[in-house]
């Protein structure tokens, strides 16, 4: 079958022909319809330090997808041939303390689809049936293909009560923009997003944020004054991993503010911890999606009117995958969707 693989320990992704995967007793075989390119896939393409330490070569990559069930393991219940599904990319062990307590998103033995085992950039994918999620009929293939990153956004945004709150989102990448849209949709008062990439800030404006701020040109304190905010932000969603953005967030949080961190900063990032202590800030680390509460909330948010369509900016057939990666690597894109039909 046709697949996109990391074939060599160097920059690039290559179109290859690989055997179709075998279906185990508890697995589903999924015929892929559409996939989306993640920032993780760009890291793998670039072959950065993280990728060199993490990715086995050769391997089929990718973990954002929608497809159709075409094969079912003999122990599987609850799925049928023809079901349209996406799937949780974190495959968990089922036997650690967190798994047994129902906190599977915190499994210490997680294996990543397209990171530690073959991924979805292929005509067919096998995953455990436990990881599959049925897509409602009124959600398009395009939107279903980005459920994985949308789940990161939903998990982060809904970590705290947002109704009537002033929310600061640092980082206007696709996940940050979707998190900002979720915050506005569920009833936040002001949703302010910051970045230095004007293309992506414009995407955030299309998604309905209160203010999209280019911090290279505007002062965040001036924006707060313009919005009538006198006590700082109630909730911070840190999506950038950029130390200056996180320090600015700490400066502008209200006392007792709550911060959810999805962005991955450098390991040696320094901050003024006195601001955390004397402001009484609560900081929560976010990884992946809650299984599967986040997935049900994702579907419900779209069904209740949340419009994510502006975040998908580029669409290509799979034979033009290089154009998709070029768009993602340029920084001048939202989500990029590849069609396998």
From Swiss-Prot:
Domain of life: Bacteria
Binding site for Zn(2+) 2: 93, 96, 99, 107
UniProt cofactor note: Binds 2 Zn(2+) ions per subunit.
Entry GO CC: cytoplasm
GO molecular function, one term: L-threonine 3-dehydrogenase activity
This enzyme's EC code(s): 1.1.1.103
Residues binding Zn(2+) 1, per UniProt: 38, 63-64
GO biological process: L-threonine catabolic process to glycine
HAMAP family (UniProt xref): Thr_dehydrog
UniProt protein name: L-threonine 3-dehydrogenase
């Amino acid at each position: 079958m046709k697949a996109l693989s990391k074939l060599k320990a160097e920059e690039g992704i290559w179109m290859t022909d690989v055997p179709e995967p075998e279906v185990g007793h508890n697995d589903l075989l999924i015929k892929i319809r559409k996939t989306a390119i993640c920032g993780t896939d760009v890291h793998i393409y670039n072959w950065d330090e993280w990728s060199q330490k993490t990715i086995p070569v050769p391997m089929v990559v990718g973990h954002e997808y929608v497809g159709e069930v075409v094969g079912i393991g003999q122990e599987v219940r609850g799925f049928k041939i023809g079901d349209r599904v996406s799937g949780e990319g974190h495959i968990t062990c089922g036997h650690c303390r967190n798994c047994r307590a129902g906190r599977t998103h915190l499994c210490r033995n997680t294996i990543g689809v397209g990171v530690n085992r073959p991924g979805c950039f292929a005509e067919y994918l096998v995953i455990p049936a436990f990881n599959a999620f049925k897509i409602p009929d009124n959600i398009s293939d395009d939107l279903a293909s980005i459920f994985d990153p949308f789940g990161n956004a939903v998990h982060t945004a809904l970590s705290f009560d947002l109704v009537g709150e002033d929310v600061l989102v640092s980082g206007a990448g696709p996940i940050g923009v979707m998190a900002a849209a979720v915050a506005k949709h569920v009833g936040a008062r002001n949703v302010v997003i910051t970045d230095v990439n004007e293309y992506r800030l414009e995407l955030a404006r299309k998604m309905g944020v209160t203010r999209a701020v280019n911090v290279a040109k505007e002062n965040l304190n001036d924006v707060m004054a313009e919005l009538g905010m006198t006590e700082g932000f109630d909730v911070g969603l840190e999506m950038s991993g950029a130390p200056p953005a996180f320090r600015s967030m700490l400066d502008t949080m209200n006392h007792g503010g709550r911060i959810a961190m999805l962005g991955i900063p450098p390991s040696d990032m320094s901050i003024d911890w006195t601001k955390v202590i004397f402001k009484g800030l609560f900081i929560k680390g976010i990884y992946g999606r809650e299984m599967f509460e986040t997935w049900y909330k994702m579907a419900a948010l779209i069904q209740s009117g949340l419009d994510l369509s502006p975040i998908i900016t580029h669409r290509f057939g799979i034979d033009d995958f290089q154009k998709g990666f070029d768009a993602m690597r340029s920084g001048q894109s939202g989500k990029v969707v590849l069609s396998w039909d």
